[in-house]
From Swiss-Prot:
The keyword Iron belongs to this UniProt entry's keyword annotation: yes
Cited PANTHER family: 2-(3-AMINO-3-CARBOXYPROPYL)HISTIDINE SYNTHASE SUBUNIT 1, DIPHTHAMIDE BIOSYNTHESIS PROTEIN
Highest taxon of the lineage: Eukaryota
Organism: Penaeus vannamei (Whiteleg shrimp)
Positions annotated to bind [4Fe-4S] cluster: C111, C215, C342
Biological pathway: Protein modification; peptidyl-diphthamide biosynthesis
Listed name of the protein: 2-(3-amino-3-carboxypropyl)histidine synthase subunit 1
One GO CC annotation: 2-(3-amino-3-carboxypropyl)histidine synthase complex
Amino acid sequence: MNMEEDTQSKEIVVAPKKEKKVFRPARSVIKGVPAEIEKDPKLQKAIEVLPSNYNFEIPKTIWRVKQANAKHVALQFPEGLLLFATSIADIIETWTEAETTIMGDVTYGACCVDDFTARAVGADFMVHYGHSCLVPIDQTGSIPCLYVFVDIQFDTVHLIDTIKSVFPSTVPLALVSIIQFVSSLQKMAQDLKSCGYTVCVPQCRPLSPGEVLGCTSPPVPEGHTIVCLGDGRFHLESIMISNPEVPTYLYNPYSKVLSREYYDQPLMKKIRKEIIDKASTAKKWGLILGTLGRQGNTKVMENLKNQLEAAGKDFVIVLLSEIFPAKLEAMSDVEAWVQVACPRLSIDWGASFPRPLLNPYEATVALKHAEWHAQRYPMDFYANESLGEWTPNHKPPCPCGQTRNTGCKGLRCPSSKQGSNKD
């Protein structure tokens, strides 16, 4: 081989490598927080005004604000964390060049992330505290949004010891919690497994493993017993409704009390079915789109509009941030309401309204577009694998008849590709 041939062969070998580099998909790399921020002694001293077992991710927040070159940061807290709002705002303003605005409107959950108001007040960056990233950051418009779950550390040893004293190792357990305690579930599961227990941490995507929302809960394997970590019944009732035959216990990390909990499923279903049946005969409907943060979902609303039109129903659309009986009573000509805001509003308080107030699933049943699930009321509002078009993330079933959980490969599924081919 002469020199020219050798040079050509080397060029041929090198060329593919260059081509790969050119066409490799670009990736967004999030670097760690710089040490000068993470280890800043003055910053650490300032953080001491906050509870030591609450992780507000202050260094990460400061770094993200600096990265975004933000000048105006909107801070959104749930009611239980508002008492820390001014301290956090002071820290952010001290260690960045941004001013802050605390958004004090009521925030019930992750669905209430209010990027609309943040933009309206001129903010160019937003931090939402206390909830998971239910509304993807690519859907919060033109404003960057950082979700801070606020992990809360608690005495996990006490819970494990309590479980060991109450349940024999022959009882399979399912551990779930609100987002603040989710980070502790996997470690506790491993500790219990090492003691001979069968433990699972169920997941309902896109939620984190073990996470429970008031409107979305994972299915629990048959024969298990649920241990739910939290300090109230709202999230607890969600997983109880979703798993009506499963014994459920609530552990309050603050009071360190483990209690057996009950929910009157037959009564709830009886009341809701009677209201659904009453609404099915209504001629004029009111369709409420919730405007509290991102509660209202236009995709779900459009599906309901189509169903109402197909049924020949007269209807009016109303925008409301919060829904009260007196507000709806003022529109006395409306015979039935359906609210696209919080599904639990109808379940928990619907009987307090003088006229039927349905959630999207119940309205779909009333309009004959879905079956009534008498055994298991759906708690799947934000689930990727939801049961019907009454949910924001619902996707029509693949021609293969399976879901991603049972083997479907989504866009890569041969059946999906075949079904999408044009003649």
